[in-house]
């Protein structure tokens, strides 16, 4: 594991940069089962749709459960829902749009709020069938069930455009623990992070802190003994 320079180590941003270095040696669920992991996609459109569906399912749900639900959708959506000439299997806009909400719900029944997400997924597919996949934030957040956090990740992973910092519970928790921000909600955290974090760090900060929050800086009983900044973190148990 490398180390940050002396100048970089100063202040909360320096603590984050050291976490970034430690993350290079950590494989977390977000690295192997996050929204950017899109196996078996045959086209760019299908890859982008996979990312959007994964993000929709991910709220209040662990990456492992979301990943399993995605696999079930790819495997279990009925072939009768495919259009003429469409390859068999896979997760496509047409297959979802042509599927019953009940069948979609059965595929994703282990994710949080699956009833609502099944209905939203069906509606999204119907919208995308008419309008195509979105490329702008305003179009993304107009879709049912898609908020700022998901839209920012979609823009980054599906469109290769980083327009902001996506903040979830891990990013919010760790940013406050290390003193990078002093905020009470994720939207305030997003605004403050975009103010204090250099733009060159925006693309990766979500993955870095989510993975760190899944493995080391967990919500309850954080593993401070394994943390590279345990002697300097203001929230350290050491």
Swiss-Prot record:
Q: Where in the cell is it found?
A: Nucleus; Mitochondrion
Q: Which cofactor does it need?
A: [4Fe-4S] cluster
- Spell out the GO cellular component terms annotated for this protein, sorted alphabetically and separated by semicolons: mitochondrion; nucleus
Q: Where is this site: Important for catalytic activity?
A: 168
Q: Which Gene3D superfamilies match?
A: Helix-hairpin-Helix base-excision DNA repair enzymes (C-terminal), Hypothetical protein, domain 2
Q: Which free-text remark accompanies the cofactor?
A: Binds 1 [4Fe-4S] cluster. The cluster does not appear to play a role in catalysis, but is probably involved in the proper positioning of the enzyme along the DNA strand.
E.C. number(s) listed in UniProt:
3.2.2.-, 4.2.99.18
Catalytic residues, per the record, are 149
Please provide an example of a Pfam family that matches this protein in its UniProt record. HhH-GPD
Record's InterPro entries? Answer: DNA_glycosylase (IPR011257), Endonuclease3_FeS-loop_motif (IPR003651), Endouclease-III_FeS-bd_BS (IPR004035), HhH-GPD_domain (IPR003265), HhH_base_excis_C (IPR023170), NTH1 (IPR030841)
Q: Which UniProt keywords apply?
A: 4Fe-4S, DNA damage, DNA repair, Glycosidase, Hydrolase, Iron, Iron-sulfur, Lyase, Metal-binding, Mitochondrion, Nucleus, Transit peptide
> What are the recorded GO MF terms, alphabetically?
4 iron, 4 sulfur cluster binding; class I DNA-(apurinic or apyrimidinic site) endonuclease activity; DNA binding; metal ion binding; oxidized pyrimidine nucleobase lesion DNA N-glycosylase activity
Superkingdom classification of source? Eukaryota
Q: Where does [4Fe-4S] cluster bind?
A: 217, 224, 227, 233
Q: Catalyzes what?
A: 2'-deoxyribonucleotide-(2'-deoxyribose 5'-phosphate)-2'-deoxyribonucleotide-DNA = a 3'-end 2'-deoxyribonucleotide-(2,3-dehydro-2,3-deoxyribose 5'-phosphate)-DNA + a 5'-end 5'-phospho-2'-deoxyribonucleoside-DNA + H(+)
GO biological processes: base-excision repair, AP site formation; nucleotide-excision repair
Question: Where does the signal sequence lie?
Answer: none
All copies of the HhH domain together span: 129-155
Similarity remark:
Belongs to the Nth/MutY family.
Q: What is the stated purpose of this protein?
A: Bifunctional DNA N-glycosylase with associated apurinic/apyrimidinic (AP) lyase function that catalyzes the first step in base excision repair (BER), the primary repair pathway for the repair of oxidative DNA damage. The DNA N-glycosylase activity releases the damaged DNA base from DNA by cleaving the N-glycosidic bond, leaving an AP site. The AP lyase activity cleaves the phosphodiester bond 3' to the AP site by a beta-elimination. Primarily recognizes and repairs oxidative base damage of pyrimidines.
- Designated name of the protein: Endonuclease III homolog
Q: What phylogenetic lineage does the species belong to?
A: Eukaryota, Fungi, Fungi incertae sedis, Microsporidia, Unikaryonidae
């Amino acid at each position: 594991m490398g180390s940050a320079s002396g100048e970089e180590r100063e202040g909360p941003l320096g603590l984050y940069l050291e976490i970034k270095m430690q993350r290079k040696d950590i494989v977390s669920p977000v690295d192997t089962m996050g929204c950017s992991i899109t196996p078996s996609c045959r086209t760019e459109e299908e890859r982008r749709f996979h990312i959007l569906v994964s993000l929709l399912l991910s709220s209040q749900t662990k990456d492992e459960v979301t990943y399993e639900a995605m696999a079930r959708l790819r495997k279990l959506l009925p072939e009768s829902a495919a259009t003429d000439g469409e390859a068999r299997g896979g997760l496509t806009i047409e297959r979802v749009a042509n599927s019953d909400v009940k069948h979609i719900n059965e595929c994703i029944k282990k994710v949080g709020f699956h009833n609502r997400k099944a209905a939203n997924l069906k509606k999204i597919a119907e919208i995308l069938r008419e309008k195509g996949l979105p490329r702008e934030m305003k179009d993304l957040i107009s879709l049912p069930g898609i908020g700022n956090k998901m839209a920012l990740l979609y823009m980054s992973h599906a469109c290769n455009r980083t327009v902001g910092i996506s903040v979830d519970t891990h990013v919010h928790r760790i940013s406050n623990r290390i003193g990078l921000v002093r905020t009470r909600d994720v939207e305030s955290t997003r605004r403050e992070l975009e103010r204090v974090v250099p733009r060159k760090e925006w693309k990766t900060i979500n993955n870095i802190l989510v993975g760190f929050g899944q493995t080391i800086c967990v919500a309850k009983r954080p593993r401070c003994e394994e943390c590279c900044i345990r002697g300097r973190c203001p929230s350290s148990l050491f």
